[in-house]
Amino acid sequence: MSAICVIKGDGVDGIINFKQNDNKSPVIISGVISGLKEGKHGFHVHEFGDTTNGCLSAGAHFNPFKKEHGSPNDENRHVGDLGNIESNKDKKSIINITDNIITLFGQNSIIGRSIVVHDKEDDLGRGNSQDSKITGNAGSRLGCGIIALSKI
């Protein structure tokens, strides 16, 4: 199964592709986002595929199992916690992620939800504030898009 997400924001745009062979396989995430300042930026699946009020209407991180925010490698993490992407000096982020928690199949599918890229680096739940365990202190939402089915 394949999905696509077109990221739009103020000066930020990109295309993210998702591929999963079956419901037991990892999801391969690939793409490019342009327009982000150099450095790391939080990158998450959010609960709603709603962009009527920009990225704010995308809701919180997708978290159907009610866990704390964490790193993509943590057992205790939101399903939507994909960590950080890194933008180079040319304001381009090349994305190549393999994730074993998100899925394109079944009740907890990410299809119809959204991807949000944030202003700051995600602290992966290791910060000293309560927000660290909820949002990773990743800051404002710079760009987002709805994850939709695509041709294989």
Curated annotation (Swiss-Prot):
Residues annotated for Cu cation binding in this entry: H44, H46, H61, H118
EC class (word): oxidoreductase
Keywords from the UniProt entry: Antioxidant, Copper, Disulfide bond, Metal-binding, Oxidoreductase, Zinc
UniProt-recorded Gene Ontology molecular function terms: copper ion binding; superoxide dismutase activity
GO CC term (a single one): cytosol
EC numbers: 1.15.1.1
Domain of life: Eukaryota
Pfam families assigned: Sod_Cu
Cofactor note: Binds 1 copper ion per subunit.
Positions contributing to Zn(2+) binding: H61, H69, H78, D81
Residue pairs linked by disulfide bridges in the UniProt entry: C55-C144
Record family assignment: Belongs to the Cu-Zn superoxide dismutase family.
Role, per record: Destroys radicals which are normally produced within the cells and which are toxic to biological systems.
Protein name: Superoxide dismutase [Cu-Zn] 5
Lineage: Eukaryota, Amoebozoa, Evosea, Eumycetozoa, Dictyostelia
